[in-house]
């Protein structure tokens, strides 16, 4: 019966290339007891131009990495253009380590035409033909990975969907969770677990002793919450490949939380511990945060220091050390408090957008990143205020249960 349930959830048997990763083949030879996995969200290419952006940035970078054991793509490989799915999967299959994928809400066939949305919702026909599986599970290095489709379309329209599992999926998940006792179980979906309908019924399936990590994409912002615990990895397309292009011709595409386009690296230990780092695409691995001098609203002559930790958690702790000013004056360390402010990077984009004329926007539409002011989950500010010249740089120390950062960074 359990075998029938498992087969009912897959289109075909998982391809041998991808299954080899579950058995330990491919990728680098594991160093010690650490399994290194890239968690990649939303390349979401819409046409050949955007496919070129992805090839020359995130896919090229992933291809060049030799420190990875495995990669999991968390959905939205394409943006409703299913003709690009075969090329996307070919590129992913060319990476020098096993890769796995979950489908996103844009990785589905769209049936257009008169009344088509009323009679036939999106489905995974092309995904099943090209990828070959939907839900799958495997254990590697004492970590159990469960990859599941949690995008549920209703029959009322092609764009109407919610996050959640069917009852059949829950039965399958229950059977998987009760086999063996790995140190950690990673549930990978497209829509964040915290946004799923019926998540309490899913939590009820998890054995009390099972340690979980929920990872996802979908939102185009980065967020970490230890109360679940949940990791929303952001989007490698950023804000849908929009923005001014860099020297390589790749759009800036800042995410709405203020994090650059990027992905997470997770180092899983055999005892269930894991370490995380955020990797900005096309930037040095050490570049994991930014620092800003933000004028006080009531006194423009004074300012507070603001830190954006691109992959930071809501329980993170930030300290900023300001360099000494003048001979005999020692630098001082300041504890920061988490803020619900809009990221300074987003504020900068909003100011840039406001400076554009209507005619310029019309002729340079793709340079316009449609960002609005909204709280970012990984912004910290000093409780102390400062006056006088802004420091050229600060030293930032960040830590949470799974991430440690020490970085000297220029103040913007």
Q: Model-predicted segments: where are they?
A:
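N-terminal active-site segment of His-dependent metallophosphoesterases
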Residues: 17-87, 388-393, 412
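Active-site glycine-centered loops adjacent to acidic/histidine catalytic or metal-binding residues
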Residues: 42, 75-76, 104-105, 190, ...
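Sec-dependent signal peptide recognition
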Residues: 2-8
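Short acidic, glycine-rich surface-loop motifs adjacent to enzyme active sites
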Residues: 74, 176-195
């Amino acid at each position: 019966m359990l075998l029938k349930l498992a087969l009912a959830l897959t289109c075909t048997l998982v391809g041998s290339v991808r299954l080899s990763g579950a058995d330990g083949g491919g990728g680098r030879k594991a160093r010690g007891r650490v399994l290194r996995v890239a968690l990649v969200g939303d390349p979401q290419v819409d046409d050949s131009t955007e496919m070129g952006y992805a090839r020359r940035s995130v896919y090229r970078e992933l291809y060049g990495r030799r420190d990875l054991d495995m990669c999991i793509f968390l959905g939205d490989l394409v943006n409703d253009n299913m003709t690009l799915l075969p090329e996307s999967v070919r590129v992913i299959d060319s990476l020098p380590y096993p890769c796995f994928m979950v489908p996103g809400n844009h990785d589905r066939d769209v049936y257009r035409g008169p009344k088509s949305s009323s009679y036939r919702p999106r489905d995974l026909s092309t995904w099943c033909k090209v990828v070959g599986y939907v839900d799958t599970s495997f254990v590697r290095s004492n970590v159990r990975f469960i990859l599941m489709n949690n995008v549920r379309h209703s029959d009322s329209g092609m764009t109407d969907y919610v996050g959640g599992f069917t009852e059949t999926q829950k039965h399958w998940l229950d059977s998987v969770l009760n086999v063996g006792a790995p140190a950690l179980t990673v549930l990978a979906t497209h829509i964040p677990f915290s946004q799923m309908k019926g998540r309490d019924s899913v939590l009820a399936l998890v054995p009390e002793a099972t340690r979980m990590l929920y990872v996802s994409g979908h939102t185009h912002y980065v967020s970490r919450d230890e109360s679940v615990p949940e990791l929303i990895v952001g989007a490698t397309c950023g804000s849908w490949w929009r923005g001014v292009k860099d020297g390589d011709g790749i759009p800036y595409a800042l995410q709405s939380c203020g994090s650059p386009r990027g992905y997470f690296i997770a180092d899983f230990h055999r005892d269930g511990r894991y370490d995380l780092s955020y990797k900005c695409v096309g930037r040095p691995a050490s570049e994991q945060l930014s620092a800003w001098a933000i004028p006080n609203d009531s006194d423009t002559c004074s300012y507070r220091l603001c830190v954006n930790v691109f992959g930071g958690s809501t329980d993170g702790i930030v300290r900023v050390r300001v360099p000494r000013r003048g001979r005999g004056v020692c630098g001082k360390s300041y504890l920061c408090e988490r803020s619900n402010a809009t990221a300074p990077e987003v504020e900068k984009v909003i100011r840039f957008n406001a400076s554009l004329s209507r005619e310029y926007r019309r002729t340079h539409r793709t340079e316009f990143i449609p960002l609005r002011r909204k709280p970012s989950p990984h912004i910290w500010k000093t409780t102390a205020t400062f006056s006088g010249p802004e420091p050229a740089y600060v030293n930032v120390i960040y830590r949470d249960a799974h991430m440690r950062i020490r970085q000297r960074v220029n103040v913007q």
